[in-house]
């Protein structure tokens, strides 16, 4: 995969291009090791400085980074024996949501998540990560299966929102989301949700009701996109950066408001810089959460989840 850069990463990109050029030019006759090390140190320092001061709009763009790992990438690096299950048994199989049985260090679990595409063909196939009602009904079918077999449920959230097309509305988009919210609140097995990219409105919430809700460091969670908010309040999407600041959509802000449980640290420069490192960090978080939830009885699990939901809106 070709490395892509956002505009605020361009100075870093220039240094990395120089490093690659020196590596290509270095051979037995010309030793450029010291110069490469100097530039590498400079690049690391610049990256640390840049990412230590990201504003909310920059974080929003990081959450959408084209090289960022998606659900299937995390499944590949965290779980074993993944067996994808398809279809809602009513209308179709929505490729914007993937899910199935897997093992987390040998333990059977149910994994469900939004899936975006990388190439144009994949983006169309995955509908840009925007599920239709059948996607949410597929997710619910898998959750009900997990409850029957007493399997923990792990969800990965990464969507700009539920698909707003006419067909989706005709097939009951709002009902599908609402039903998922209700049923997830009543599941008697542990549910762990993680925002890995964009957490867009009801489309995210439909697989986001859990006992633990985590966010990756450069992910976002909001009722609307910054561009959408700006278009409504200021009649111009160009005010997106201003909207992002006032929306409080970053992981750090949502942690302050007690709307999420923990923030999973990303590698220097973002999750796309090292799929292995971010997968290891997230896997550790999932295992710790599961160990904690395993100590609770069914009644304690449900009571704690209810209290969690009822606390929203109070600081």
Curated annotation (Swiss-Prot):
Known function: Component of the acetyl coenzyme A carboxylase (ACC) complex. First, biotin carboxylase catalyzes the carboxylation of biotin on its carrier protein (BCCP) and then the CO(2) group is transferred by the carboxyltransferase to acetyl-CoA to form malonyl-CoA.
Compartment(s): Cytoplasm
PANTHER family, per database record: ACETYL-COENZYME A CARBOXYLASE CARBOXYL TRANSFERASE SUBUNIT ALPHA, ACETYL-COENZYME A CARBOXYLASE CARBOXYL TRANSFERASE SUBUNIT ALPHA, CHLOROPLASTIC
Protein name in the entry: Acetyl-coenzyme A carboxylase carboxyl transferase subunit alpha
The CoA carboxyltransferase C-terminal domain, residue ranges: 38-292
HAMAP family linked: AcetylCoA_CT_alpha
Family classification: Belongs to the AccA family.
Cellular component GO terms held in the UniProt record: acetyl-CoA carboxylase complex
């Amino acid at each position: 995969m070709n490395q892509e850069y956002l505009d605020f990463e361009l100075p870093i990109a220039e240094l990395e291009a120089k490093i690659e050029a020196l590596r290509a030019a270095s051979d037995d006759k010309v030793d450029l090791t010291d110069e490469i090390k100097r530039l590498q140190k400079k690049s690391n320092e610049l990256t640390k400085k840049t990412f230590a001061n990201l504003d909310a709009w920059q974080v929003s763009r990081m959450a959408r980074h084209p090289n960022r790992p998606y659900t299937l990438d995390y499944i590949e690096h965290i779980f074993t024996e993944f067996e994808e299950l398809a279809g809602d048994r009513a209308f179709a199989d929505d490729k914007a949501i993937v899910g199935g049985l897997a093992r987390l260090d040998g333990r059977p679990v149910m994994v469900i998540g939004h899936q975006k595409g990388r190439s144009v063909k994949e983006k169309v196939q995955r509908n840009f990560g925007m599920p239709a009602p059948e996607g949410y009904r597929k997710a619910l079918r898998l959750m009900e299966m997990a409850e029957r077999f007493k399997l923990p449920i792990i969800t990965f959230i990464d969507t700009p929102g539920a698909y707003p097309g006419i067909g989706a509305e005709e097939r009951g988009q709002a009902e599908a989301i609402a039903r998922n919210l209700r049923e997830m609140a009543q599941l008697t097995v542990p549910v762990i949700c993680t925002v890995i990219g964009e957490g867009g409105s009801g489309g995210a919430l439909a697989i986001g009701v859990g006992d633990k809700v985590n966010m990756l460091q450069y992910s976002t969670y909001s009722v609307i996109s910054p561009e959408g908010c700006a278009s409504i309040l200021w009649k111009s999407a160009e005010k997106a950066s201003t909207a992002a600041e006032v929306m409080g959509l970053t992981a750090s802000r949502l942690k302050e408001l007690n709307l999420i449980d923990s923030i999973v640290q990303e590698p220097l420069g973002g999750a796309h810089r090292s799929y292995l490192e971010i997968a290891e960090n997230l896997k550790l978080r999932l295992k710790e959460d599961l160990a904690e939830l395993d100590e609770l009885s069914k009644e304690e699990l449900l009571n704690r989840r209810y209290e969690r939901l009822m606390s929203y809106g109070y600081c």
